[in-house]
Every structure is written in structure tokens, then in C-alpha cells.
Amino acid sequence: MRWNLVCLEKKKGGLGVRNLALMNKALLSKWNWCFTIESEALWKQVISHKYGVEEGGWCTRAVSGRHGVGLWKAIKKEWLGMYSSLAYRMGSGRRVRFWKNKWCGDEPLCLSFPSLFVISLAKDVWVLDVWNPDGVGDGWTPLFSRAFNDWEIEMVERFMLKIQAFRVQREDEDKVVWITSKSGAFSVKCFILF
């Protein structure tokens, strides 16, 4: 009997056995989710101290070494798999990458506006660093390596309209959101159904 038939629900003609590989991925991904949202948890502090944290603090650095790292290495590996289902709800903008994180629509700005990303002077800049709170009104100040050509003006207008819908809230924390659930929170069930 084929494994995919065994894993089908009983009402669909299967045996109703859960796909263990998928369940394992979901449970490992749950650890990644907990790492992103539990900022003060003791276990997170221990893991962060042992492996280091990537800038922004959403996940640990890549795990290297041969001894004693197998479990966290497997958990970290699932971070890459779940990353496409994450978005960022911007608060202060201190932990969200302006070009590379998904905070302003369905994809990162570097994918929505690749030709602008190419001429950007700061490709790894944080959202807060592109936000200018000075002057008459708050505004965005992305820096580019050259003046825009005539044929690029319409694209720049679309770009500016897209980001102008968002404002940095300095007193609020940046948050991660699981986009496949209505609540924005990760769940094993939602992961499996996705």
C-alpha cells in the first residue's frame, strides 16, 4: 500500500495516519515561531547565547559544528522553509529590513521593485533608517545611486505610493505575522493544512 493512501483521511479512503514527516516539520517550525515571539524566555536566551542571533533578532545564526547541535540545527533548517509564510507588522522599524523583509505588501520591496533595489545605496537598511521624522510631516527617504530616468518615474511613483501607506510607530515593537492564519499566529494545524 502506498504511504500517501495511508495518510489520507478515512472518509477519503485512507487509514487516517498522519504524515509524520510533515508533522515533524510543523513541530520544528513551532519552535522557530516561539523563538521569534518569546523575547524574554529563558530558553531563548540560552539558545541565543550559544548560537548567536541574526540582526533583527528573529532567528539564530546558522548552526555549525558537529557535536551537540543536531536538534537546534534541524530547527534552524526549518526557519528557511517557513520564512515565505512570514510577514512583519512594523512598529518602530528597528528590526525590519526595508528592502528584504515582507512588511509592505505580499512580497519584499526588493522583489516588487527590483530595478530600484539595484540602484539603492543601502540594500540592508532597516525601515527606521529610511524613515525621516523631521520637518513638516513624517516621510520616507530611501537613497539611490543616481537620478531617475524618465521611463522610471512612473515606477518610482508606484513605489512611493506603496510605502507612504505605512508609518513608523517608534513606541511600538515590530512583530512577526504568520500570513496563512487569520489570527496571524502560527499553529501546527495551519502549517499542516497550508
Regions found by a protein language model. Give the residues of each.
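A helix-boundary/hinge signal
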Residues: M1-F194
